[in-house]
């Protein structure tokens, strides 16, 4: 039996990277998936009766409610929420940070997952089961990975994950976070290179390079590697795991 057989899964950020890999993996494991992204449906997501693609801006005030209602309308329930969608900053230190990038990072990386959890939790409580997987980052436990806005948003998301895990364990609802580090994805494609804080980047490069150089293939972590862990935490095979911060970073978390 497939690990997500008959489960209804919401995946945000599903048009590329980790979200796309997770959407494909969930379908392969028997799930019915509501795939959400601000971008249009990618051509590689073929027509599938178990898939519904919903184009949506997560920063819209009604986004969380709209996504939840769409999932209930199409699939009749919600078993799993996977909060993948995220943006990065320009590696800005606090002295070069703009209000816009701070507010944008918080809106997408923290506010959107929190609001979606708020919407789905009553449904999960009523059915006495559910699994939530949030995508944090190596930056959620370190100050030497990205800029201050991204770092703060991912630290905060880990705190939210732990709080939800503890508060709703009596309802048989689990909440965990994946903490990727050095993943090949499109998250950096929208960065304005002219706004990058290169002085900050210079302090981080030696650490990042050391992570890559001791891999036999010199490759970054693949989106599929992260998706495999997400599927495990979404499934009943991890029924006693809640409140975990799981690093997928080739050992980066050890330094």
Swiss-Prot record:
The active site is at 136 (proton donor), 150 (proton acceptor), 154 (lowers pka of active site tyr). PROSITE patterns: ADH_SHORT. The keyword NADP applies. Its EC number is 1.1.1.-. Pathway: Secondary metabolite biosynthesis; terpenoid biosynthesis. NADP(+) binds at residues 11, 57, 118, 150, 154, 183. Coiled coil: none annotated. GO terms for molecular function: oxidoreductase activity. Keywords: NADP, Oxidoreductase. Belongs to the short-chain dehydrogenases/reductases (SDR) family. This is Short-chain dehydrogenase/reductase esdpF. The lineage of its organism: Eukaryota, Fungi, Dikarya, Ascomycota, Pezizomycotina.
